Amino acid sequence: MSGRLKIVVMLGGPSAEREVSLRSGAGVVKALRSLGHTVVELDPKTPDWILPPDTEVVCLAPLHGTYGEDGTVQRQLEKLGVLFTGCDSEASRIAFDKVLTKQKCIESGVPTTKFVVVNSEKTPLPKNLQLPLVVKPVRQGSSVGLQFVERAEDWQNALAEALKFDSEVLVEEKIVGRETTVGILDGVALPVLEICPKAGGFDYRNKYTAGCTEYFCPAEFDAATTQRIQAAALGAFHAIGGRDYARVDVMVRANGGPVVLEVNTLPGMTETSLLPKAAAAAGLSYEELCQQMIDLALKRKQAAKERKEHKKETASVAFA
């Protein structure tokens, strides 16, 4: 859809996921340059960043964590009137807050886990939830601060560790089943990807340490179960008001019932990350995935222009 463009790729940033973001950014920059675009790297580690003149589109794909995923940078770019890839500021804000995401899922009838919110290390083990539990910061990504509570005596340590990363933590029942994730691209669910850690859960270590986790895409589910998983993922994506692309984490119970865990509006973009794996299973190379993210932003810009022109034409006819 696009010719050669001047693209600013934001990467790094001030969050706890800075190193992951830099790794994602290196891949995106390389891919876009290989496609002939002029690419400028911008690290918004301080709030006084300035966009280069003549920037045509800002690619936010690699900017993970607080500031990148919580709607802050999207809000700044919206105020500047600058075109950028991915979800808008409101959808980003909702998705980054795991509690808001669950509330939106519940309102939309999307299956999700039973949960409580805790803000103190002194909080006793919730009586309305059954062990094992998952404890995680309300506003973090990349499994930062994620803890598993298998026994009651693990509770206080898990809570204290998760509270290091946010003032509130989400406590939810650990779903027994198969762990999957579903990429969403231009309103279409990509092939389901199954995540199989060799030991423990899909925490920060297993996510970013080579050889700790196996991935299967497309996952081996029957057609009906696959459709249910993809439908739940799309439901969550629409519930938060998503656009362009995202990745939705879904647990699958033994009976095939999907349970949405969270929505990632800026998922990992290293060449071995999960969204690129799912795109590859759908026949898209890493470079094609990066290009489609740019094209989706340009498509939105063109649609907005056409709506504006149509509105002017309608007004002209009305006053003729």
Which sequence ranges carry the predicted segments?
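ATP-binding N-terminal substructure of ATP-dependent carboxylate-amine bond-forming enzymes
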Residues: 1-96, 100, 107, 119-126, ...
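A short small-residue
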Residues: 3-10, 209-219, 274
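ATP-dependent carboxylate activation and anion-phosphoryl transfer catalytic cores
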Residues: 5, 109, 222-320
